[in-house]
Amino acid sequence: MLRFVGTGASHVGLVRDHNEDAAFSSPYLALVADGVGGAAAGEVASATAAYVVAATTRAHPEQDPVVVLGDAIRRAVVDLHRGVALDPERRGMATTLTALATDGHRVVLAHIGDSRAYLLRDGQLSRVSHDHTLVQALVDSGDITAESVRHHPMRNVVMRSLHAGAGDEADLQPDIHVLDARSGDRFLVCSDGLTDMVEDRAVAHIVSTRDAETATRDLVQAALDGGGRDNVTVLVVDLLDDPQTVRLSGDGQLLGALRDPRNVVDPGTLQRP
Protein backbone atom coordinates (compact mmCIF):
# COMPACT_ATOMS: atom_id res chain seq x y z
CA MET A 1 0.00 0.00 0.00
CA LEU A 2 1.38 3.38 -1.00
CA ARG A 3 1.62 5.95 1.76
CA PHE A 4 3.33 9.29 2.37
CA VAL A 5 6.22 9.46 4.82
CA GLY A 6 7.73 12.84 5.56
CA THR A 7 7.40 16.01 7.54
CA GLY A 8 6.43 19.66 7.33
CA ALA A 9 7.05 23.07 8.85
CA SER A 10 5.28 26.42 8.89
CA HIS A 11 6.76 29.79 9.87
CA VAL A 12 5.09 33.17 10.23
CA GLY A 13 7.97 34.81 8.36
CA LEU A 14 9.78 38.03 9.16
CA VAL A 15 7.10 40.60 8.24
CA ARG A 16 3.61 39.26 9.01
CA ASP A 17 2.32 39.29 12.59
CA HIS A 18 0.31 36.06 12.31
CA ASN A 19 0.24 32.90 10.23
CA GLU A 20 -2.53 32.52 7.64
CA ASP A 21 -1.08 29.28 6.23
CA ALA A 22 -2.52 25.94 7.35
CA ALA A 23 -1.18 22.50 6.58
CA PHE A 24 -1.70 18.83 7.33
CA SER A 25 0.63 15.90 6.67
CA SER A 26 -0.22 12.25 7.21
CA PRO A 27 0.31 8.86 5.56
CA TYR A 28 -2.67 9.50 3.26
CA LEU A 29 -2.70 13.29 2.78
CA ALA A 30 -0.29 16.19 2.26
CA LEU A 31 -2.11 19.53 2.18
CA VAL A 32 -1.23 23.22 2.24
CA ALA A 33 -3.78 26.07 2.34
CA ASP A 34 -2.85 29.75 2.27
CA GLY A 35 -5.34 32.38 3.39
CA VAL A 36 -5.47 34.80 0.47
CA GLY A 37 -3.54 37.95 1.30
CA GLY A 38 -5.50 41.03 2.27
CA ALA A 39 -8.77 39.19 2.83
CA ALA A 40 -10.48 39.18 6.22
CA ALA A 41 -9.82 36.14 8.42
CA GLY A 42 -7.45 34.39 6.03
CA GLU A 43 -6.37 32.08 8.84
CA VAL A 44 -9.99 30.98 9.39
CA ALA A 45 -10.42 30.22 5.70
CA SER A 46 -7.20 28.22 5.42
CA ALA A 47 -7.62 26.32 8.69
CA THR A 48 -11.26 25.48 8.00
CA ALA A 49 -10.54 24.21 4.49
CA ALA A 50 -7.56 22.19 5.72
CA TYR A 51 -9.57 20.73 8.60
CA VAL A 52 -12.54 19.68 6.47
CA VAL A 53 -10.36 18.08 3.78
CA ALA A 54 -8.17 16.32 6.36
CA ALA A 55 -11.14 15.03 8.35
CA THR A 56 -12.96 13.82 5.24
CA THR A 57 -9.98 11.99 3.77
CA ARG A 58 -9.17 10.46 7.15
CA ALA A 59 -12.71 9.12 7.38
CA HIS A 60 -12.42 7.51 3.92
CA PRO A 61 -8.74 6.52 3.54
CA GLU A 62 -9.28 3.73 1.01
CA GLN A 63 -12.03 5.29 -1.11
CA ASP A 64 -11.44 6.90 -4.50
CA PRO A 65 -9.49 10.07 -3.64
CA VAL A 66 -10.87 11.86 -6.70
CA VAL A 67 -14.36 11.59 -5.23
CA VAL A 68 -13.27 12.14 -1.63
CA LEU A 69 -11.30 15.29 -2.40
CA GLY A 70 -14.08 16.73 -4.55
CA ASP A 71 -16.66 16.13 -1.82
CA ALA A 72 -14.35 17.49 0.87
CA ILE A 73 -13.69 20.72 -0.98
CA ARG A 74 -17.39 21.29 -1.56
CA ARG A 75 -17.98 20.77 2.16
CA ALA A 76 -15.19 23.21 2.94
CA VAL A 77 -16.88 25.92 0.89
CA VAL A 78 -20.13 25.30 2.77
CA ASP A 79 -18.29 25.77 6.05
CA LEU A 80 -16.71 28.99 4.81
CA HIS A 81 -20.21 30.32 4.17
CA ARG A 82 -21.17 29.23 7.69
CA GLY A 83 -18.19 31.09 9.05
CA VAL A 84 -19.35 34.31 7.42
CA ALA A 85 -22.89 33.77 8.70
CA LEU A 86 -21.50 33.41 12.23
CA ASP A 87 -19.30 36.50 11.91
CA PRO A 88 -20.04 38.93 9.03
CA GLU A 89 -16.63 40.56 9.54
CA ARG A 90 -15.18 37.44 7.92
CA ARG A 91 -16.85 38.35 4.64
CA GLY A 92 -14.25 38.15 1.90
CA MET A 93 -12.15 35.43 3.50
CA ALA A 94 -10.63 33.01 1.01
CA THR A 95 -7.89 30.41 0.73
CA THR A 96 -5.80 28.49 -1.72
CA LEU A 97 -5.63 24.72 -1.34
CA THR A 98 -3.17 22.20 -2.73
CA ALA A 99 -3.57 18.60 -1.59
CA LEU A 100 -2.10 15.22 -2.47
CA ALA A 101 -4.14 12.21 -1.35
CA THR A 102 -3.58 8.48 -1.73
CA ASP A 103 -5.86 5.50 -1.25
CA GLY A 104 -2.85 3.19 -1.17
CA HIS A 105 -2.84 2.55 -4.91
CA ARG A 106 -2.65 5.94 -6.62
CA VAL A 107 -2.02 9.60 -5.86
CA VAL A 108 -4.51 12.37 -6.66
CA LEU A 109 -3.84 16.11 -6.74
CA ALA A 110 -6.51 18.68 -5.86
CA HIS A 111 -5.42 22.25 -6.45
CA ILE A 112 -6.85 25.76 -6.48
CA GLY A 113 -4.89 29.00 -6.14
CA ASP A 114 -1.14 29.52 -6.10
CA SER A 115 0.18 27.13 -3.50
CA ARG A 116 2.17 24.47 -5.33
CA ALA A 117 2.95 20.77 -5.58
CA TYR A 118 6.18 19.43 -7.07
CA LEU A 119 7.38 15.92 -7.94
CA LEU A 120 11.00 14.83 -7.54
CA ARG A 121 11.88 11.77 -9.60
CA ASP A 122 15.30 10.62 -10.81
CA GLY A 123 16.83 13.82 -9.47
CA GLN A 124 14.52 16.10 -11.47
CA LEU A 125 12.01 18.41 -9.78
CA SER A 126 8.90 19.25 -11.81
CA ARG A 127 5.78 21.19 -10.89
CA VAL A 128 2.58 19.14 -11.03
CA SER A 129 0.18 21.96 -10.11
CA HIS A 130 -0.74 24.93 -12.29
CA ASP A 131 -1.04 28.36 -10.67
CA HIS A 132 -4.45 30.03 -10.86
CA THR A 133 -2.97 33.52 -11.02
CA LEU A 134 -3.04 36.48 -13.35
CA VAL A 135 0.65 36.15 -14.17
CA GLN A 136 0.30 32.43 -14.98
CA ALA A 137 -2.52 33.31 -17.37
CA LEU A 138 -0.21 35.85 -19.00
CA VAL A 139 2.49 33.19 -19.31
CA ASP A 140 -0.01 30.75 -20.81
CA SER A 141 -1.08 33.35 -23.39
CA GLY A 142 2.53 34.19 -24.28
CA ASP A 143 2.31 37.78 -23.05
CA ILE A 144 5.13 37.37 -20.51
CA THR A 145 7.87 34.82 -19.91
CA ALA A 146 7.95 32.34 -17.06
CA GLU A 147 11.24 33.87 -15.93
CA SER A 148 9.58 37.25 -15.33
CA VAL A 149 6.85 35.94 -13.01
CA ARG A 150 8.74 36.21 -9.70
CA HIS A 151 9.31 39.95 -10.18
CA HIS A 152 6.03 40.88 -11.89
CA PRO A 153 4.03 43.56 -9.98
CA MET A 154 0.82 41.49 -10.33
CA ARG A 155 2.36 38.16 -9.31
CA ASN A 156 0.17 37.82 -6.20
CA VAL A 157 -3.20 38.27 -7.92
CA VAL A 158 -5.02 34.95 -7.41
CA MET A 159 -7.78 34.24 -9.93
CA ARG A 160 -9.32 31.16 -8.29
CA SER A 161 -9.67 30.28 -4.63
CA LEU A 162 -12.05 28.75 -2.11
CA HIS A 163 -14.21 31.53 -0.70
CA ALA A 164 -17.60 32.42 0.74
CA GLY A 165 -18.41 35.29 -1.58
CA ALA A 166 -20.62 35.71 -4.60
CA GLY A 167 -19.28 35.18 -8.07
CA ASP A 168 -18.78 32.70 -10.87
CA GLU A 169 -19.04 29.09 -9.68
CA ALA A 170 -16.06 28.28 -11.89
CA ASP A 171 -13.87 30.38 -9.57
CA LEU A 172 -14.44 27.76 -6.86
CA GLN A 173 -13.60 24.69 -8.95
CA PRO A 174 -10.31 22.99 -8.13
CA ASP A 175 -8.20 21.05 -10.59
CA ILE A 176 -8.42 17.38 -9.59
CA HIS A 177 -6.51 14.68 -11.42
CA VAL A 178 -4.63 11.44 -10.92
CA LEU A 179 -0.85 11.79 -10.97
CA ASP A 180 1.67 9.45 -12.52
CA ALA A 181 3.19 8.43 -9.19
CA ARG A 182 5.23 5.47 -8.01
CA SER A 183 6.97 4.26 -4.90
CA GLY A 184 10.18 6.22 -4.39
CA ASP A 185 8.79 9.53 -5.63
CA ARG A 186 9.19 12.59 -3.44
CA PHE A 187 6.65 15.41 -3.30
CA LEU A 188 7.00 19.01 -2.17
CA VAL A 189 3.82 20.92 -1.28
CA CYS A 190 4.29 24.55 -0.31
CA SER A 191 2.79 28.01 -0.02
CA ASP A 192 3.99 30.92 -2.14
CA GLY A 193 5.98 32.12 0.85
CA LEU A 194 8.60 29.65 -0.36
CA THR A 195 8.39 30.03 -4.12
CA ASP A 196 8.25 33.84 -4.05
CA MET A 197 11.42 33.97 -1.93
CA VAL A 198 13.57 31.14 -3.31
CA GLU A 199 14.66 30.48 -6.89
CA ASP A 200 13.47 27.22 -8.46
CA ARG A 201 17.05 25.97 -8.86
CA ALA A 202 17.73 26.41 -5.16
CA VAL A 203 14.48 24.66 -4.24
CA ALA A 204 15.33 21.75 -6.53
CA HIS A 205 18.83 21.43 -5.08
CA ILE A 206 17.59 21.33 -1.49
CA VAL A 207 14.76 18.87 -2.18
CA SER A 208 17.00 16.51 -4.16
CA THR A 209 20.03 16.43 -1.84
CA ARG A 210 18.58 16.20 1.68
CA ASP A 211 16.43 13.81 3.66
CA ALA A 212 12.84 15.00 4.09
CA GLU A 213 13.32 16.53 7.54
CA THR A 214 16.49 18.40 6.61
CA ALA A 215 15.02 19.55 3.30
CA THR A 216 11.96 20.94 5.07
CA ARG A 217 14.07 22.86 7.56
CA ASP A 218 16.46 24.19 4.91
CA LEU A 219 13.65 25.30 2.58
CA VAL A 220 12.00 27.33 5.34
CA GLN A 221 15.36 28.85 6.25
CA ALA A 222 16.03 29.72 2.60
CA ALA A 223 12.70 31.56 2.44
CA LEU A 224 13.60 33.51 5.58
CA ASP A 225 17.07 34.27 4.22
CA GLY A 226 15.38 35.52 1.03
CA GLY A 227 13.41 38.11 2.97
CA GLY A 228 10.62 36.16 4.69
CA ARG A 229 8.01 38.62 3.46
CA ASP A 230 5.18 36.09 3.77
CA ASN A 231 4.20 33.11 5.84
CA VAL A 232 6.06 30.05 4.57
CA THR A 233 4.82 26.47 4.75
CA VAL A 234 6.61 23.42 3.39
CA LEU A 235 5.78 19.70 3.29
CA VAL A 236 8.33 17.20 1.97
CA VAL A 237 6.96 13.66 1.73
CA ASP A 238 8.23 10.45 0.17
CA LEU A 239 5.82 7.99 -1.43
CA LEU A 240 6.65 4.54 -0.08
CA ASP A 241 5.18 1.06 -0.27
CA ASP A 242 5.99 0.10 3.31
CA PRO A 243 3.22 -0.83 5.76
CA GLN A 244 5.57 -0.79 8.76
CA THR A 245 6.62 2.79 8.01
CA VAL A 246 2.97 3.78 7.73
CA ARG A 247 2.16 2.42 11.20
CA LEU A 248 4.97 4.46 12.70
CA SER A 249 3.86 7.67 11.00
CA GLY A 250 0.96 8.48 13.33
CA ASP A 251 -2.33 10.15 12.49
CA GLY A 252 -1.03 13.41 11.11
CA GLN A 253 0.87 16.64 11.67
CA LEU A 254 -1.04 19.92 12.07
CA LEU A 255 0.79 23.07 11.05
CA GLY A 256 0.27 26.83 11.00
CA ALA A 257 -3.23 28.17 11.54
CA LEU A 258 -4.60 24.64 11.80
CA ARG A 259 -2.90 24.23 15.18
CA ASP A 260 -5.34 26.70 16.76
CA PRO A 261 -8.86 25.20 16.93
CA ARG A 262 -10.32 28.71 17.21
CA ASN A 263 -9.50 29.19 13.53
CA VAL A 264 -11.74 26.33 12.44
CA VAL A 265 -15.41 27.01 11.75
CA ASP A 266 -17.40 24.45 13.73
CA PRO A 267 -19.95 22.98 11.31
CA GLY A 268 -22.23 22.19 14.25
CA THR A 269 -22.55 25.74 15.52
CA LEU A 270 -24.94 26.89 12.81
CA GLN A 271 -28.10 25.07 11.87
CA ARG A 272 -28.48 24.08 8.26
CA PRO A 273 -31.33 25.92 6.51
Where are these regions (language model features)?
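PP2C/PPM-type serine/threonine phosphatase catalytic domain
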Residues: 1-273
